[in-house]
């Protein structure tokens, strides 16, 4: 399963670990992904999404129906 938020599209970015002596080694910064089930009243079913915590806040703000409509408009299968 890929580490990409289904709502925001956030994915891992690459950076450096920097030691006290300023030696740099490559590392990945992973998004804070959570699997969450949402009840969709219009469809009378649960929808399971893998999303970042900022994606959860977007759903809290805009509502699950409007977010699902945007995802389907992008061509994502939900």
Curated annotation (Swiss-Prot):
The keyword Ribonucleoprotein applies. The gene is rpmB. This is Large ribosomal subunit protein bL28. PANTHER family: 39S RIBOSOMAL PROTEIN L28, MITOCHONDRIAL, LARGE RIBOSOMAL SUBUNIT PROTEIN BL28M. GO terms for cellular component: cytosolic large ribosomal subunit. The lineage of its organism: Bacteria, Pseudomonadati, Pseudomonadota, Gammaproteobacteria, Thiotrichales. Belongs to the bacterial ribosomal protein bL28 family. It comes from Hydrogenovibrio crunogenus (strain DSM 25203 / XCL-2). NCBIfam families: L28 (TIGR00009). HAMAP family: Ribosomal_bL28. SUPFAM superfamilies: L28p-like. InterPro entries: Ribosomal_bL28 (IPR026569), Ribosomal_bL28/bL31-like_sf (IPR034704), Ribosomal_bL28_bact-type (IPR001383), Ribosomal_bL28_sf (IPR037147). The keyword Ribosomal protein applies. GO terms for biological process: translation. It comes from the Bacteria. Keywords: Ribonucleoprotein, Ribosomal protein. GO terms for molecular function: structural constituent of ribosome.
């Amino acid at each position: 399963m890929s580490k990409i938020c289904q709502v925001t599209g956030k994915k891992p970015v690459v950076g450096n670990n920097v030691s006290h002596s300023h030696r740099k080694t490559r590392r990945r910064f992973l998004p804070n992904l959570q699997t969450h089930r949402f009840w969709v009243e219009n469809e009378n079913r649960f929808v399971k999404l893998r999303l970042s915590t900022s994606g959860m806040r977007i759903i809290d703000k805009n509502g699950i129906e409007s977010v699902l409509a945007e995802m389907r408009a992008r061509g994502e299968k939900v």
